[in-house]
Every structure is written in C-alpha cells, then in structure tokens.
C-alpha cells in the first residue's frame, strides 16, 4: 500500500497561498451570538422509557473482542439510525435518531432507556422540547472534564431552528444536565457533528433551504465550553460561527482524543473534502479556527491548506445511491461526497496525528464497488499524509466508516458492507502501530445482515461512531446499523468493543 510521507513545507506553503486566493470571499464570519435558552434538566434516570425495543442480536457472531451486543432498534417513520455512541467511566451512551439508551459499558446491560431525545429538554420550554423533528443527535464524552455532551437539532416546520446541547453535571449519564439551546442558523441545520477541543465545543453542520432542503452552505461554530461546564446563564454563553459560500463543500470539525493536550496555542482544525472540478479534484482542505472569547469579533478561520490526495473517484459518483442489496433493485446512499464518522486528533508528544476516512470507488478486473479509504495525517499545522490505505479485500461494497486511534497509535475502522449477495451488515478492520504503513489486518465481522432495506427513499445512515474508552485510552467502541429482515425501515444497531494486543491496562 502506497504511503505518502514527504509533503514539504514549501509545497504546503505554495498550496496555502494558491488556495487562499481561490477561497477569498467564500468564508463569512465571525458571526457572534449567545445561547437563547439555559435551564437544568430533570435527571435522565427519571425520564419515561419508550416502548421502542432494544433487539436481541441472534445474528451476532463471537468476535475476539470484549462486547458485542444489540443496540437500539428502529422507530416507525425513522428511515435510518445515524448511530452515535461514546464510553464514559462505567457507562456507554448510544444515540439513534430520536432516542437515547444508557448501557453498562462492560456488560452491555441497559441502565436507562430508550428515552425520547427531546424529553431531556422538557424544562427548556422551547422547540428543543416540543419539536417532533429532533434528530441528527450525537454524543461524546469530554474526558478532560469527565462529563457527557449530547446534541441534536430541532427543526419544526417554519422554524425556529435550534441546536440543542446538553452538558451533564457529573460523570453519570443518568443524572442532570445543563441545557443550552442555540440558534446558529436561520435556516435548516443538517447533519451536525460535535467535537471537543480545550478552548471550545465545536459543531460543524450543513445549512439547507427550509422548504426545498437544498444545500446552501456549510457552517462551523465554537460554543463557550468553560461557561457551559460551569452552568452559567444563557446570555453569558457565546457562540462564534464561520460559514462558507454555497460553492464550498461540507466542513468537518476535529475532536481531541486522550488526556494530552495540543501544544499551547494550537487551535481547532477544520477539514473539507473538496471535489469541485473548477478547484481541482481530490483535495483535502484544512482550516484553522482560532477563538478569542475575550473579544469574539477577533476570532478567525484561516486557510485552507490544500492537501492533494492520491487520485480516486467518489463512491457512488459523489451523492448518488449505488450500493446494491440482495433481493431488491433498491440501491443505498454511499455518501461519497464527505468525510464520514469522526475526525480525531492525538498528541503523542513527539508528533501529532489526525485520522479520518471517506468512501471511494475501487475498480479492478472484478468490477467497481465502494471502498473505505483511511488516512493518518501528521503535523496538522502543515498537514502531511503519514499513511493511507484502502479497505476493499473483495467485491463487496464498504462504506459509512467510523475511525479512531488509541494511545499506542493503533487504528480501527468500522463500516457497513453490502452487495447483491451480501445483506447490509457491519464489520471492522484494524491497523496496529507496528503494521506496515497503509495496511489493514484481516477484517472482523460484527453482525451478519439478513435483510435489505426495501424503502424507495434509498437513504442510509451518513454516520457511524468509533470511539475510545477514556479510562484505559485503548479500548475501542463501535456502533452502526444493519438489517436482520427485509423491510422499508426496520434497521437495528449493534454496539461492540475490542482491543489491540498493546492494550494491557
């Protein structure tokens, strides 16, 4: 597997100058605002449970891991899960569209849930509590403060459109939360992603026309983390946003892994898979988001540095469905136009590392199919591809990846699989830090699917989550969706954990 290790600083500087000219006038901001609602929730353990089942996973095989249990299942009218999950000190929280469930992270036993996503916001009195379009939720564990952070968007017909964010008051996910609701855009927010950096919580999201749901721009916002952790009132919790023009692709924020902070003064990195023909295809753009909470109007988002990627063709020809399934002519959305899952950062002391993935088309004599391409970047201020690889050992389609890296530099990628003979299921592959650059070990099956999605919508989750246990900093947790029987929207989810041999804590 080819590894690109030698992007020089001169090359990066030339790319930065050229690309900055091309992007002139296409970034708007800073746009400074503050929370519109602040309250404290009822304890999550006291919120009513829904009848929505957590299905048993008779199909799940035994793997060389720690945990492989059923997560939450589908709800009528909810076409896909967008499964998000994170481990805390003793618990694992999974979000799917519209509901939460809290598990014992060691046994998989349900502690609380399923709980309606908007019920945690019942004390807010705004659309975060009342809208039945509360979805696109994500969860993360802030390992620096030992608290949970949950978010979703509320998008009732006609607005207002709010980003609903909750920060737990302790490390117990079943307890109370500080509730903050933000109006980051006057239009429809779509597919928000949540990230941790020492100076802020960050959200990146697309902004759509409220009526047509057509893409208008992408947006990235900083939320005042220290104030939210302290539970201060809404008027004193600021937000700082930047947004691109309609011609700029989706922004994706970077989340800190581990306890080692970035070097002093290093700011949030924002990434963008840029496939615009007039800008030159196969670029990965990186920006630097500097927040100034003492004077928010002095905040900046600089860049991009344009990183030329090894040549590829987008999975599914950019945004078109193409993933086949057995027993139906319906094909699934492959999300080839964006980075999928989380983008995560680690400071190893002697170097800094960022990992990410997206879906491409791999063509061989056996034909074409969607495949996972993954990257490890070093020195993110002037990004250098340290290693990259493609996961495509056969003719099965692989897409919707989630990636993370442990404290030893081991990398794992989870993803969906499907083909005309393989039902949509879940697998993962690992790269130990001692393995040859760009190579993944033999993939492991988490769940063998036994059904196809037969709905004509063709949508599939655009998000799955690989995360790291904050206690040992080396146990991986992964959650994604699959089908056990053919139906229009009867998806199920799975939660699994595993370790590399280097993880001995």
Language model feature labels by segment:
Residues 2-11:
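Bacterial N-terminal signal peptides that target proteins for export
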Residues 10-20:
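Bacterial N-terminal signal peptides
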Residues 25-505:
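C-terminal PAP-associated
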């Amino acid at each position: 597997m080819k590894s690109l290790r030698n992007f020089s600083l001169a090359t990066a500087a030339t790319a930065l100058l050229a690309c900055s000219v091309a992007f002139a006038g296409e970034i708007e901001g800073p746009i400074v605002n503050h929370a519109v609602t602040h309250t404290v929730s009822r304890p999550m353990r006291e919120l009513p449970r829904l009848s929505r089942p957590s299905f048993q996973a008779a199909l799940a095989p035994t793997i060389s891991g720690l945990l492989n249990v059923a997560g939450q299942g589908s709800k009528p009218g909810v076409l896909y899960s967008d499964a998000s999950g994170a481990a805390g000190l003793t618990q694992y929280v999974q979000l799917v569209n519209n509901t939460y469930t809290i598990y014992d992270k060691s046994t998989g036993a349900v502690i609380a849930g399923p709980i309606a996503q908007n019920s945690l916001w019942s004390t807010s009195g705004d659309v975060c509590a009342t809208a039945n379009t509360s979805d696109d939720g994500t969860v993360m564990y802030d390992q620096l403060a030992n608290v949970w952070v949950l978010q979703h968007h509320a998008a009732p017909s006609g607005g207002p459109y709010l980003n609903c964010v909750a920060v737990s008051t302790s490390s117990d996910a079943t307890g109370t939360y500080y509730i903050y609701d933000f109006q980051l855009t006057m239009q429809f927010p779509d597919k928000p992603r949540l990230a941790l950096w020492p100076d802020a919580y960050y959200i990146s999201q697309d902004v759509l026309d409220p009526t047509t749901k057509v893409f208008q721009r992408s947006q990235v916002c900083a939320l005042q983390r220290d104030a939210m952790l302290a539970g201060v009132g809404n008027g004193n919790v600021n937000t700082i946003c930047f947004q691109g023009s309609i011609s700029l692709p989706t922004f994706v924020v970077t989340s800190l892994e581990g306890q080692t902070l970035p070097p002093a003064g290093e700011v949030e990195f924002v990434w963008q898979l840029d496939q615009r023909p007039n800008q030159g295809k196969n670029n990965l753009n990186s920006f630097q988001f500097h927040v100034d909470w003492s004077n928010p109007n002095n905040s900046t988002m600089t860049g991009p540095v344009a990183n030329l990627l090894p040549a590829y063709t987008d999975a599914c020809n950019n945004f078109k469905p193409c993933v086949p399934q057995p027993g139906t002519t319906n094909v699934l959305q492959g999300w080839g136009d964006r980075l999928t899952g989380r983008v995560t950062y680690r400071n190893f002391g002697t170097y800094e590392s960022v990992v990410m993935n997206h879906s491409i088309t791999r063509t061989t004599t056996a034909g074409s199919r969607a495949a996972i391409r993954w990257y490890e970047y070093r020195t993110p201020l002037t990004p250098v591809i340290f290693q990259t690889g493609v996961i495509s050992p056969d003719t099965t389609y692989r897409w919707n990846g989630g990636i993370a890296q442990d404290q030893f530099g081991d990398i794992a990628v989870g993803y969906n699989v499907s083909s005309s003979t393989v039902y949509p299921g879940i697998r993962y592959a690992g790269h130990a830090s001692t393995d040859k650059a760009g190579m993944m070990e033999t993939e492991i099956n988490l769940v063998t699917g036994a059904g196809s999605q037969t709905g004509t919508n063709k949508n599939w989750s655009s998000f799955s989550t690989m995360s790291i246990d904050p206690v040992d900093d080396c146990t991986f947790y992964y959650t994604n969706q699959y089908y056990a029987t053919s139906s229009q929207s009867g998806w199920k989810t799975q939660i699994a954990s595993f370790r590399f041999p280097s993880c001995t804590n």
